[in-house]
């Protein structure tokens, strides 16, 4: 029984320490994040947890996300709404060379999707574009793959629209 109590104590102590570290990291992240950002809310807390798991400094990570968001203007990528900060956070988990290579790919991927679905493709597709862009595939290939998934999902009985496009984008990642 003593060993079991010691083990339980270690688990509880470690959980308490982790919870305190997570809360302190959330506070540091939110202090470095503009109040109007998507990252200022609960979504930012999820990003903090992932950053913490990778031993990232939360305040430095928030600054990196903002710096990457700033690059979106240079590449004429969508900068307003819910998804641009999420796309920047996704990219922030990657190296500088990967981010640099991903930005023009994101633009090309969005253009490929817009060619197939001009009324559906918006800034809301930016996170999915970032997820595909860091993988390094050519935009034409990504466009074809997503469109194939879109048509297959539609033929299986799903309704056309933004939700189907998002499902196709995510399905094409696997």
Language model features with spans:
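A contiguous, surface-oriented mixed alpha/beta subdomain in the mid-to-C-terminal portion of proteins
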Residues: 96-100, 109-174
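Short helix-capping/linker segments at secondary-structure and domain boundaries
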Residues: 12-18, 54-62, 92-100, 135-143, ...
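N-terminal domain-start signal
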Residues: 1-86, 121, 158
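Residue-level detector of solvent-exposed, low-hydrophobicity positions
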Residues: 43, 68, 82-84, 89, ...
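Hydrophobic core segments within long, regular secondary-structure runs in both alpha-
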Residues: 22-30, 62-70, 100-114, 143-151
């Amino acid at each position: 029984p003593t060993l079991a109590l010691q083990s339980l104590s270690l688990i509880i102590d470690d959980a308490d320490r982790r919870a305190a570290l997570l809360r302190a990291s959330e506070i540091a992240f939110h202090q470095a994040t503009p109040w109007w950002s998507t990252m200022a809310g609960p979504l930012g807390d999820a990003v903090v947890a992932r950053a913490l798991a990778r031993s990232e400094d939360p305040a430095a990570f928030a600054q990196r996300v903002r710096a990457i968001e700033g690059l979106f203007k240079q590449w004429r990528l969508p900068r307003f709404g819910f998804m641009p900060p999420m796309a920047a956070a996704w990219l922030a988990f990657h190296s500088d060379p990967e981010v640099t290579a991903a930005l023009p790919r994101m633009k090309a991927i969005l253009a490929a999707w817009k060619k197939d679905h001009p009324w559906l493709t918006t800034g809301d597709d930016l996170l999915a574009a970032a997820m595909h862009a860091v993988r390094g595939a050519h935009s034409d290939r990504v466009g074809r793959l997503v469109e194939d998934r879109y048509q297959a999902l539609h033929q299986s009985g799903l309704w056309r629209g933004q939700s189907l496009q998002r499902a196709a984008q995510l399905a094409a990642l696997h």
